């Protein structure tokens, strides 16, 4: 998320050829199906925790770049940004002191949703045998092992599935709550 955030801030603030290059790179990443990309990388590299973290990070940064870019495009023409430019504040300081703090609430909410998505990606890749490998523990591995015993030991697959569902639901609810708490429109209502 950090790489995507930096790329999005630079792209949105400076515009021009930087924006074009960053957005074409994100378009290229979006054109590749996430699961297919992850499967290719995980079959080329040694499947394990570090490889899985790398794959999830590489597949998530374009989303952050687009989200942050759209926020920056909305902020860069605000009066306080224009005033900062007028008094000679450098672009770096404007990005760090004015833009970054104002996109932080959106970034936090999107990060919680990204965590939920990452859990689902990890579980699905581990279920397919491309993620975390036994004897390491993963809900996806537990689901994969339990599917062979559904008729006799149904709980082996049911409880990991419920755990995944409840965890993702809890994280999504946390993201919605954070959105409501951090939304500037709701500040006067509390």
Residue ranges and their predicted role:
Residues 1-190:
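Alpha-helical transmembrane segments of integral membrane proteins
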């Amino acid at each position: 998320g950090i790489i995507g955030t930096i790329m999005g801030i630079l792209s949105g603030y400076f515009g021009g050829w930087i924006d074009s290059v960053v957005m074409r790179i994100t378009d290229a990443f979006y054109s590749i199906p996430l699961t297919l990309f992850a499967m290719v990388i995980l079959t080329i590299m040694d499947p394990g925790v570090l490889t899985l973290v790398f794959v999830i990070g590489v597949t998530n940064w374009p989303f952050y770049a687009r989200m942050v870019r759209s926020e920056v495009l909305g902020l860069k023409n605000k009066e306080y940004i224009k005033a900062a430019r007028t008094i000679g504040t450098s672009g770096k300081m404007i990005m760090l002191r004015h833009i970054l703090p104002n996109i932080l609430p959106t970034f936090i909410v999107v990060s919680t949703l990204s965590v939920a998505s990452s859990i689902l990606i990890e579980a699905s890749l581990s279920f397919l045998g491309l993620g975390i490998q036994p004897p390491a523990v993963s809900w996806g591995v537990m689901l994969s092992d339990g599917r062979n015993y559904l008729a006799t030991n149904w709980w082996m697959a049911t409880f990991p599935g419920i755990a995944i569902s409840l965890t993702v639901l809890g994280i999504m609810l946390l993201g919605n709550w954070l959105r409501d708490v951090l939304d500037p429109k709701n500040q006067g209502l509390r």
